Amino acid sequence: MEFSSPSREECPKPLSRVSIMAGSLTGLLLLQAVSWASGARPCIPKSFGYSSVVCVCNATYCDSFDPPTFPALGTFSRYESTRSGRRMELSMGPIQANHTGTGLLLTLQPEQKFQKVKGFGGAMTDAAALNILALSPPAQNLLLKSYFSEEGIGYNIIRVPMASCDFSIRTYTYADTPDDFQLHNFSLPEEDTKLKIPLIHRALQLAQRPVSLLASPWTSPTWLKTNGAVNGKGSLKGQPGDIYHQTWARYFVKFLDAYAEHKLQFWAVTAENEPSAGLLSGYPFQCLGFTPEHQRDFIARDLGPTLANSTHHNVRLLMLDDQRLLLPHWAKVVLTDPEAAKYVHGIAVHWYLDFLAPAKATLGETHRLFPNTMLFASEACVGSKFWEQSVRLGSWDRGMQYSHSIITNLLYHVVGWTDWNLALNPEGGPNWVRNFVDSPIIVDITKDTFYKQPMFYHLGHFSKFIPEGSQRVGLVASQKNDLDAVALMHPDGSAVVVVLNRSSKDVPLTIKDPAVGFLETISPGYSIHTYLWRRQ
């Protein structure tokens, strides 16, 4: 994750809505607020004493949005979220023919084309499913709508752990019968058949966009491992190409077969969740160790051919699925081997050590070396570090960490960004090793209530407005500034710009689109905005 020292984790602060709103109003004379349309519902805010608020949802009410609004040519839509409590509030303004502003100018460069976006989403862990299903059915539906429907933030990616992970309440794999090398006893437990699979189907039914499923394994069955345990330092027995590696590769196909029987098809699998974890003595939860050389040979001799020769040959294979600190070295080892490289579609990265790994030296260099291998951010959450509180209800800082990471990733060729647990309880679990963390949605089953945190809306500023197939384009600033910004073009040619202000200062701002003119606006302190406009 982007580095946040203990001092940056905010202490409880009183909300200062009036001052922020006043500051933003002075610079927004051209913008006209749009009243909540018939389908949209405003946030019911609640403060838990941190820097911002959560939005409260229950069985009968949850804030919602209309589908993204593209106004007539010559005007723009602006969606605003602020620390003071605004949540993706819509306003509109005219696009000016001439530049009258004196502040920062951001110029769109549509001829500079970069990566096409796959999408945004989160993980349907056992813990997430348990929390969602602990709500009453009407509240469950409102939570799923919040993530996946047009009146929510339009997620189009769901990551699915293959069997248990730390966010499970027990340890299991799909083939726990010892020495079952033919996997005759492979079966999905109730965590899949009663929890995850029904919820994934409900999410797909609610989604207006096609949703892509991504699977990741944490551990193999223990009888395939050198240490005979789900956790701790251990890897597959034997060598790539042998019965242990072949069995583990066929386990992937059996998983895809089993989900296909439940009418679920996967877009991609990762070769292993955090393969470096299983190289560490005493690692506390499910893992399976691979060095880059071991992963290279496993992909080349076992996993790649096994997938390619199965009915799931269209399922993409992503390597690494670990900290970007391991790049570009890990990519060099795997992708300079033509036998491994031919099976690898992309490189998945996690955010937890990003503060040690500058994006340019890792993502940027990897893209330079392997421009045809896509980069995909597959996991992120806050609250996992020893100095961090697990859950901070209403933390604006944590929302900013998310959006800063997303913008940074987009600027360095990453095609998608996936959050970790879709929902957790107020403790940040359940988690069988008590590795509690935060989540964009926190479920309080005692009140049949769930809380949508600032992280949820920060993610929504991207997921709702950047559909699959959108392409990042150039955006150049006229001077040094404290804003984070990224520009993209929708498949239909319309434009979207996301601007994040992590500072306390309001920043007058003009966005120039050579095709249509100038968008005069302001970026208030501690705010995030998404701008949309038609170009033809």
Curated annotation (Swiss-Prot):
Changing residue 400 to I: In GD2; uncertain significance. Changing residue 43 to S: Loss of glucosylceramidase activity. Optimum temperature is 43 degrees Celsius. Changing residue 255 to Y: In GD; loss of glucosylceramidase activity;. The lineage of its organism: Eukaryota, Metazoa, Chordata, Craniata, Vertebrata. The gene is GBA1. Changing residue 227 to S: In GD1 and GD3; decreased glucosylceramide catabolic process. It comes from Homo sapiens. This is Lysosomal acid glucosylceramidase. It is a peripheral membrane protein. Changing residue 310 to N: In GD1; severely decreased glucosylceramidase activity; less than 5% of normal activity. Changing residue 159 to Q: In GD1 and GD2; decreased glucosylceramidase activity; 13% of normal activity. Changing residue 457 to C: In GD and GD1. Changing residue 416 to S: In GD1 and GD3. Changing residue 237 to E: In GD2; severe; loss of glucosylceramidase activity; increases susceptibility to proteolytic degradation. Changing residue 196 to Q: In GD1; decreased protein abundance; decreased glucosylceramide catabolic process. Changing residue 408 to M: In GD1; likely benign. The active site is at 274 (proton donor), 379 (nucleophile). Changing residue 482 to N: Likely benign; found in a patient with Parkinson disease. Changing residue 221 to L: In GD1; very low glucosylceramidase activity. Changing residue 363 to P: In GD1; uncertain significance; also found in a patient with Parkinson disease; uncertain significance.
